[in-house]
Regions:
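Short terminal alpha-helical segments
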Residues: 1-32, 84
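General helical structural elements
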Residues: 7-8, 16, 41, 50, ...
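Generic low-complexity, intrinsically disordered sequence content enriched
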Residues: 10, 15-18, 59, 91-95
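Enrichment for repetitive, rod-forming helical segments
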Residues: 10-11, 44, 80, 88
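Amphipathic alpha-helical interaction modules
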Residues: 17-60
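Amphipathic alpha-helical binding modules
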Residues: 65-100
């Protein structure tokens, strides 16, 4: 398994964990571990590309912030999940292009 596949696998697991923790409800979770892990995986994914131009340049680190309001927490987790899935898509397409 190459680095790209490992990152994709880890991103999928992070998405699954964020989904399950969000189902607990009432905001009894922290957003920080999810943002922190996403940022680390994003940094690793960037090393797979020659430059940060193009689509990889559209990704930004997610602030490691933990609001008190449950609705705000849900918005942050949803944003993280969107970024996770977009990054997975980019990595999968880049993998397909590399194999052709």
């Amino acid at each position: 398994m190459d680095k790209r596949e490992l990152i994709i696998h880890m991103l999928r697991q992070l998405d699954e964990q964020s989904r399950s923790i969000q189902q607990i409800g009432a905001g009894y979770y922290s957003c920080v571990p999810f943002a922190r892990r996403f940022n680390k995986l994003l940094a690793e994914a960037r090393t797979l590309f020659e430059t940060s131009d193009g689509l990889m340049g559209t990704f930004e680190e997610i602030p490691e912030f933990d609001p008190k309001d449950p609705a705000d927490k849900m918005k942050i987790i949803q944003g993280i999940r969107v970024e996770i899935n977009q990054l997975i898509s980019l990595l999968e397409v880049a993998e397909e292009d590399a194999s052709q």
